[in-house]
Amino acid sequence: MKQHPAILAIDAGNTSIKAALFRNSSIVSTSTVCDAEELRAWLKDLPAPSGAAACSVRPSVNESLAAVVSDFGITLQFLGSDLPADVPLEVEEPDKVGADRLANAIAAYHRARGPAIVVDFGTAIAFDVISPTGAFIGGAIAPGLQTSLAALHEKTALLPLIEVAPPPDAVGRNTVDAMLVGVVHGAAGVVDRIVDNIREQLKFDFTVFFSGGHSRIVAPICRTHAQMAPTLTLEGVHLAWSRHNRPDAS
């Protein structure tokens, strides 16, 4: 039986590069790497991709990522430039909507088949709001967990630089735990309030998705019911590639 071709999807964020190899609509393998050379090493033992697409909010790595993909004799298509997103942008500055938010909108609407809110926990906590017709209509941006912890360290004399971790309790009994309680519980409160406000203002029956590296730390504390979607951005990149590179695509 003939196998579907392998397609590589890349999400180049501010602090890391995530990648997934797809066959048809299924993910074969995923990885989080620091740079293009680590991506090349990860791909070495996987089926060679016959197509590749990326969303990038870090232009400095685009050339090196494209070079890795060119090893397979294919061209890396970047969402929003080489690769159309086909997402209506009902915002005041459509040219400033990040490629990762376009990818989230594509995948969330594909999954929900209706209005959706994506909460993406990365360097920033980004809220992407998708209308009942699949348009990106805006959202909100708040500091991410590691960003908040780093700011506490940088803007104070004595608070240490620590890594994100689940807080042990609602009350921190030492400095590190107190920082984790404040940042993680604070983020959960921000998520609940913003999602509630969006629902109250727009009156849509939203499906909510949690994505991004720190979603599993915040989700247990949130009141907001959400579907966990750790690969949502990569799914959106793959969907965009598939729509424009299938044999019958114009």
Predicted regions mapped to residue ranges:
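Nucleotide/phosphate-binding catalytic cleft detector across ATP-hydrolyzing
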Residues: 1-12, 26-116, 133-250
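Short beta-strand scaffold segments in enzyme catalytic cores
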Residues: 17-21, 118, 125-130
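Acidic, glycine-rich active-site loops and adjacent beta-strand->loop/helix elements
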Residues: 83, 124-125
